[in-house]
């Protein structure tokens, strides 16, 4: 599902979603169903392999939710992924995939944008599971990005990472200002 990394099922599905392949594509829908049948971790998210069978990756869950929602996966089949994501919100309002691996205490723009895209696509598809919780988390995550003025440290005012100013495609899991601006224009 996730290896080899850049040509894996996961990133292929993300690319197809970002290219706006028709959302009723049956082959893609069947592939997503197979992922859901074979790759759920103990925490309800998507496992990448044996090392993530207990704790899934927050970034991957956000990206998976994005394309699974876009391709009209059954809402009920995504409840555990929503629950898993909502359990990972950090005190500063965003998300960080390293919380389950190395105990990160500050949110990451990379992870936060992936989760925001997933939650927004879930709602855009008309799904209503945990609607109020999702709205609250989206608000705090957007505030987290805006607090950083898209790319600046909230502590020092310096550029967090110069790569945030490079406009790349496909972005995969990486954050940049174009991806953030695209998110804001897409979600209104």
Where do the model's predicted regions map?
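Preference for long, amphipathic alpha-helical scaffolds in soluble/luminal domains
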Residues: 1-188
């Amino acid at each position: 599902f996730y290896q080899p990394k850049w040509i894996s099922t996961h990133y292929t599905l993300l690319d197809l979603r970002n290219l706006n392949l028709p959302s009723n594509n049956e082959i893609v829908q069947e592939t997503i169903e197979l992922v859901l049948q074979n790759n759920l971790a103990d925490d309800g998210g998507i496992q990448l392999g044996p090392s993530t069978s207990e704790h899934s990756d927050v970034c991957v869950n956000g990206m998976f939710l994005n394309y699974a929602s876009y391709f009209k996966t059954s809402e009920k089949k995504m409840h555990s992924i929503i629950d898993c994501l909502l359990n990972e919100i950090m005190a500063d309002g965003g998300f960080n995939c390293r919380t389950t691996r190395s105990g990160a205490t500050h949110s990451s723009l990379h992870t936060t944008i992936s989760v925001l895209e997933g939650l927004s696509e879930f709602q855009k598809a008309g799904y209503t599971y945990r609607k109020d919780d999702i709205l609250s988390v989206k608000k705090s995550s957007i505030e987290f990005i805006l607090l950083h003025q898209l790319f600046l440290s909230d502590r020092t005012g310096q550029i967090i990472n110069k790569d945030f100013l490079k406009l790349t495609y496909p972005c995969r899991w990486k954050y940049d200002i174009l991806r953030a601006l695209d998110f804001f224009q897409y979600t209104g």
